[in-house]
């Protein structure tokens, strides 16, 4: 297989390397300070810190004659494009992900670039109360969550989906991928079947927002997100998408 620049900024499933090696690709890890060489390797996995680091590594790949690049981005980029009025880029994570995605797509006239957008496991902001990684509040004998949700993807599906983009992705095309769309309440019911779960009324968002702000203040922390927007809108939004056509394009049934 030809040399491939494989770029991702978030942790991928443990079995990802095993899956891509079956396809004849051997991912190598490079950090921003490394001298990169593309003459004897099949792929490079690069942990970029920002769009400038990403541009640097892509430029090196192009200079070395690499013809193909695949970037793994967060599905949040999809929702940022779909809902421009929500201004999701106010959150630094969304801004960074979107900037990096746009930066690598800008090279599509010099190198074949495909993007895989998957729901990635990354730490939720400290401003959000969570239970088992799900936005929720623990009460005496029940859980309170929000009337929202987002797409999910399993480790095996994530590895297979990204591999499909590596093998079959077209230049300049973005592929949003997921297994299913899940609401916070259903995720908690699945994880904690013996605990009752209720959805916190949206009109009382300000109660939890004030509590979150107070908790941060006691911990000596400053909010990195707009808590008002977070609790008034974002946690009650269903960030769902249907990737049926995308999966068909990649060879899935």
Regions found by a protein language model. Name each.
Residues 1-43, 52:
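N-terminal Rossmann/SDR dinucleotide-binding element
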Residues 2, 17-20, 38, 236-253:
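Amphipathic terminal alpha-helices
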Residues 8, 48, 70-74, 117-119, ...:
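Active-site beta-alpha turn of Rossmann-fold NAD(P)-dependent dehydrogenases/reductases
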Residues 43, 56-95, 114:
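Conserved Rossmann-fold NAD(P)-dependent oxidoreductase catalytic core, especially the SDR/UDP-sugar
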Residues 80-122, 141-142:
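Catalytic helix-loop patch of NAD(P)-dependent Rossmann-fold dehydrogenases
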Residues 95, 150-153, 241:
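Residue-level signal for the nucleotide or nucleotide-sugar donor/cofactor binding architecture
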Residues 112-157:
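NAD(P)-dependent short-chain dehydrogenase/reductase
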Residues 161-225, 243, 248:
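Mid/C-terminal beta-alpha module of Rossmann-like enzyme folds, strongest
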């Amino acid at each position: 297989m030809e040399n491939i620049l494989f770029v991702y900024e978030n942790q991928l499933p443990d079995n990802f390397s095993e899956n891509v090696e079956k396809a004849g690709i051997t991912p190598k890890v490079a950090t921003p300070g490394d001298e990169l060489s593309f003459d004897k390797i099949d792929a490079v996995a690069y942990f970029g810190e920002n769009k400038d680091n990403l541009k640097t590594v892509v430029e090196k790949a192009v200079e070395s004659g690499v013809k193909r690049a695949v970037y793994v981005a967060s599905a949040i980029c999809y929702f940022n494009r779909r809902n421009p009025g929500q201004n999701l880029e106010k959150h630094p994570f969304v801004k960074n992900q979107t900037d990096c995605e746009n930066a690598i797509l800008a090279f599509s006239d010099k190198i074949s670039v495909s993007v895989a957008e998957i729901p990635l496991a990354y730490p939720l902001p400290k401003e959000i109360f969570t239970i088992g990684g799900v936005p929720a509040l623990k009460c005496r004998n029940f859980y309170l969550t929000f009337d929202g949700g987002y797409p999910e993807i399993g480790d095996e599906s994530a590895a297979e989906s990204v591999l499909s983009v590596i093998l079959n992705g077209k230049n300049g095309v973005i592929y949003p991928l997921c297994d299913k769309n899940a609401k916070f309440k259903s995720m908690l019911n699945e994880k904690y079947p013996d605990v009752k779960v209720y959805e916190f009324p949206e009109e009382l968002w300000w109660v939890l927002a004030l509590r979150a702000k107070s908790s941060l203040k006691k911990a000596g922390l400053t909010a990195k997100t707009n808590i008002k927007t977070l609790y008034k809108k974002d946690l009650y939004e269903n960030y769902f998408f249907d990737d049926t056509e995308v999966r068909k394009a990649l060879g899935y049934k």
